[in-house]
A protein has these predicted regions:
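Short, surface-exposed loop or secondary-structure junction motifs
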Residues: 1-192
Length: 192
């Protein structure tokens, strides 16, 4: 499949009136995420999935005051592994990039963000190309990535916008890399 909405697994289905998303607005589906797609705004998270504190169990930082249970990352990888391939046609999917991160980490024996910083970004003199930019910079130094995100219920600044990468803790093969226009230009120059 091109995309799996993993984040639906952290939402309590009993807290949603009707389907989680639909093509028209009503009293429960007020959050518009695309031209013809409205999401339920008043959902609750499944018990044991989300905390407002970083603890040994809740380690995947999704947004300010929002930590996901660390077991969820493994459930994402298991669901991807169970996906059937459609060998008849090509469909773009970011799932292969999520798996690519696992390959990089297995081969290098390092977390992907640390490996890339050490082997690529630092040697190129890139100071602002990184995952998890809030570990080095303030929000005032980072462009916001989303306004009133439907899942995290807040403006997103310094956290990855992509829900899959957010559910992976902000470091993923499919999304989560922050940079500046100048540093992206340096990467393109290197490729030339």
């Amino acid at each position: 499949p091109p995309y799996i909405r993993f984040y639906l697994d952290i939402i309590d289905p009993n807290s949603v009136h009707g389907p989680y998303s639909q093509s028209w607005v009503d009293e429960w589906h007020r959050t518009q995420v695309s031209e013809h797609s409205y999401y339920c705004s008043d959902f609750k998270f499944r018990k044991g999935m989300v905390s407002d504190k970083n603890t040994p169990v809740y380690t995947l930082h999704m947004a300010d005051g929002m930590w996901l249970n660390k077991s969820f990352k493994n459930s994402i990888l298991q669901r991807i592994a169970k996906c059937e391939l459609d060998g008849k046609r090509y469909v773009y999917s970011d799932l292969g990039f999520v798996l690519l991160q696992q390959v990089v980490e297995k081969v290098t024996e390092l977390p992907m963000d640390l490996y890339l910083a050490r082997e690529f970004y630092a040697p190129m003199g890139l100071q602002r190309t990184m995952f998890l930019p809030l570990t080095k910079f303030t929000k005032a130094e980072i462009m916001p990535t989303a306004s009133n995100d439907f899942l995290r219920r807040q403006d997103i600044c310094g956290y990855v916008h992509d829900e899959t990468a957010a559910c992976m803790g902000g470091v993923s093969g499919n999304a989560g890399l922050f940079s500046t226009a100048e540093e992206v230009a340096k990467v393109y120059q290197m490729l030339l």
